Amino acid sequence: AGGHTIQDDEPKYGLCVTGFVNPASMWKNIGAETGDVLILTKPLGTGILSTAVKGEMASEEETAYAASVMATLNRYARDKVVDLQVHACTDVTGFGLAGHALEMAKGSGKTLCISLGSLPIMKGALDSASMGFIPAGAYRNREFAGGECEFSWKNHSGESSENFWLEKTRCEAVENETGRSETIINEAELAAREDIVFDPQTSGGLL
């Protein structure tokens, strides 16, 4: 269940979908447990790319790619994990990854650790963010959630008063287990990735 909060000058139309669900089969945005792995099913950046499109600064390829991602149903991701034990799930939409992850963390009484370097990001979104194509909703999301997110250069020690911990490097434990090489990210890209964390998503994925 969900909805949209819209504040702009463009006309919109709305739809309503109703149905039935078995309460025992519902996934809620609370209930995350210590040791759970976070899976993000779609790349981030729709709000930033949409802003770039309105500014006529996005390429045809970037525009088509963003549209294809938004048109992809979450049903396919759901079907891949429906037989697994999912403790918590949320969509990533208007409040951005930060807002929805924070809601999950608070509701579960846990701290979520997310590596900025590991986040999937749409083609062109980093460049568009670096050029300043940040939607107004991203600033509101940062104002709402930014004070409860902690950005750190170091790996999370497991002890934090924050609900949401964002690392500026990949999680060391993940690197050691998978054998993947370290990703080096410069300051400009880090700033753009921080903006994308707060970017409001249209037809975003699941977390």
Feature annotation, model-predicted:
Residues 1-207:
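Helix-biased detector of long, well-ordered alpha-helical tracts
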